[in-house]
Swiss-Prot record:
This is Antibacterial protein 2. One of its GO terms (molecular function) is toxin activity. Belongs to the staphylococcal hemolytic protein family. It comes from Staphylococcus haemolyticus. It is found in: Secreted. Its main location: secreted.
Protein backbone atom coordinates (compact mmCIF):
# COMPACT_ATOMS: atom_id res chain seq x y z
CA UNK A 1 0.00 0.00 0.00
CA UNK A 2 2.96 2.32 0.57
CA UNK A 3 3.83 2.20 -3.13
CA UNK A 4 0.31 3.29 -4.05
CA UNK A 5 0.45 6.18 -1.59
CA UNK A 6 3.80 7.31 -2.97
CA UNK A 7 2.49 7.11 -6.53
CA UNK A 8 -0.57 9.20 -5.61
CA UNK A 9 1.67 11.76 -3.92
CA UNK A 10 3.87 11.94 -7.02
CA UNK A 11 0.82 12.38 -9.24
CA UNK A 12 -0.50 15.23 -7.11
CA UNK A 13 2.88 16.97 -7.06
CA UNK A 14 3.28 16.54 -10.82
CA UNK A 15 -0.17 18.02 -11.41
CA UNK A 16 0.60 21.00 -9.22
CA UNK A 17 3.90 21.55 -11.03
CA UNK A 18 2.28 20.96 -14.44
CA UNK A 19 4.80 18.20 -15.20
CA UNK A 20 2.57 16.23 -17.54
CA UNK A 21 5.08 13.46 -18.30
CA UNK A 22 5.61 12.71 -14.62
CA UNK A 23 1.86 12.89 -14.07
CA UNK A 24 1.28 10.24 -16.73
CA UNK A 25 3.91 7.89 -15.35
CA UNK A 26 2.58 8.39 -11.82
CA UNK A 27 -0.92 7.43 -12.94
CA UNK A 28 0.48 4.29 -14.56
CA UNK A 29 2.32 3.51 -11.30
CA UNK A 30 -0.96 3.85 -9.38
CA UNK A 31 -2.70 1.40 -11.72
CA UNK A 32 0.22 -1.03 -11.70
CA UNK A 33 0.56 -1.02 -7.93
CA UNK A 34 -3.20 -1.33 -7.51
CA UNK A 35 -3.28 -4.42 -9.70
CA UNK A 36 -0.38 -5.89 -7.71
CA UNK A 37 -2.19 -5.31 -4.41
CA UNK A 38 -5.43 -6.81 -5.73
CA UNK A 39 -3.51 -9.84 -6.97
CA UNK A 40 -2.10 -10.34 -3.48
CA UNK A 41 -5.55 -10.03 -1.91
CA UNK A 42 -7.18 -12.50 -4.29
CA UNK A 43 -4.19 -14.84 -4.43
CA UNK A 44 -3.39 -14.60 -8.13
Amino acid sequence: MEKIANAVKSAIEAGQNQDWTKLGTSILDIVSNGVTELSKIFGF
